[in-house]
């Protein structure tokens, strides 16, 4: 079966935003206008197509990123048919892992901002993730019909907070309840959408007289940005010649794909205005798989290479999401970077070193599915029947093995003990937790060796709450959850030049002998653990050096202060001795572990605690209370901003340990009128009194 859509007509995009910017509603309109949905699903009534988990429909927030395929021929039916694969990503900070893994497989993104709230903290997080994967972007300012909507303020915030280079390709006609439509700065026409047809019909009209001057001014900036794409256009522009509509669009596309500009538009998805033009911009300005660089990868021996987006190349794909479907079982979502794969083909997973046969291939539309026979370069689809693949792993042709770059997932910052309510729950709970951990790499499960309790860890209270809720709904497991615990870390502050570890056992028969000398140094935050082999002259034989490292790495799991994981240390093995008969791997492993523990004691060990970036939006009357409360929680105030229409945003860095139950406290402080967001920022040394309290609690 031949490819239906040429690859240059593909657009793999994400729709990303802060919670409440109206992203899911925007996606719903996209599905409506592209003809997938005949009735618009509203988030308000829990009927949105992309939000298909029960909890998402109840809470009105998007948790998992559903992938959907749609087709678009242009607002005026003026394009050849384009295939748009959309990944809907969550906007809540507890689910940044979902955003991260979808950014990895996208070619472009639409950033949705609220015209009232503007650039909010999660918008900055998503922006950083898009920068990391160099994803070209459009900005869509939504909710232009809301009180306090201000398109130009969002433009200023994008420059200031995101250090972006937004270029307006539209300006709004009116705002708040008077928002009527937009001025298309390329065509220099006003666009009005017909409300009776839910925005499926529109008209081009003359620009209102009062907006003429503003439109000319913003068009001039846009044309100048377009002219900067090449010397040829710049000469034409400086010579006073008019650039054609085609030249402007081609130049804006070139600069968008190069990540030099962010074309900016506006509308109100809820009132059916603007999303149609945003879809046109996706086709006209965002890249196809052919417009982005070939994907970097490695051969089995580590040699760097690339794979082009071409059906003739050998098959390679990246698994970016695992989901359990109630009807077909485990689904692996993947992005095809090169080649073709048919259902029934055998593929190879180089990370696991295993071959697997692909069962069925499915094209997903939110939670509906269509069975397909094959997938091509550029496709995003789901496979059934792969037992071993997990998120971030490569799937490739067994005869042409490559490894695509691995994804790096954040370490959890919060833990809770979870206990089954009944004996039957006990058996099901292990299975349920393992299944959930397989789907979500930022969720970890372990058993506490001392208490025997099951400990779950994740990115925030809401993250864990939703996973426990899924356990109940999807697996029928009732569980009680303990108090949240902070994921502290331990490190050192001093250099220790010479620490000896000697493990000697001389009893009858064969003894044990391992002797090492280490140097320990603190590393800069976030650098992790590093082991350096500086042995000269074979004083520790080559074959025992990995055992020394293994002994140290095992010790890292439990620090000497309160048993928390140890981070950011460099250990250099530079001397030691061995015994011809009694030395073995185990003896050197023990010696490495002993030396490291001793060195930790001598190198000024400290406890590190996770610090959170907290932003509180509050009416001005309560600002003093909010700031006082944050300070009492050991918060460090970072600044304040005004909210249009009154109110303030207070920004602070606060230890996670002080933020449990904050939503209840904030509600009572502000009569329920303030909201907040919080995300992990970095680890910082805990004050002495806090460290002592944590150590005392652990010692009980």
Curated annotation (Swiss-Prot):
GO terms for molecular function: GTP binding; GTPase activity; guanosine tetraphosphate binding; translation elongation factor activity. GO terms for cellular component: cytoplasm. It is found in: Cytoplasm. It holds the Pfam family GTP_EFTU_D2. Its main location: cytoplasm. CDD domains: EF-G, EFG_III, EFG_mtEFG1_IV, EFG_mtEFG_C, EFG_mtEFG_II. The keyword Protein biosynthesis applies. Residues 8-290 form the tr-type G domain. One of its GO terms (biological process) is ribosome disassembly. Keywords: Cytoplasm, Elongation factor, GTP-binding, Nucleotide-binding, Protein biosynthesis. The keyword GTP-binding applies. GTP binds at residues 17-24, 88-92, 142-145. Catalyzes the GTP-dependent ribosomal translocation step during translation elongation. During this step, the ribosome changes from the pre-translocational (PRE) to the post-translocational (POST) state as the newly formed A-site-bound peptidyl-tRNA and P-site-bound deacylated tRNA move to the P and E sites, respectively. Catalyzes the coordinated movement of the two tRNA molecules, the mRNA and conformational changes in the ribosome. Belongs to the TRAFAC class translation factor GTPase superfamily. Classic translation factor GTPase family. EF-G/EF-2 subfamily. This is Elongation factor G. The gene is fusA.
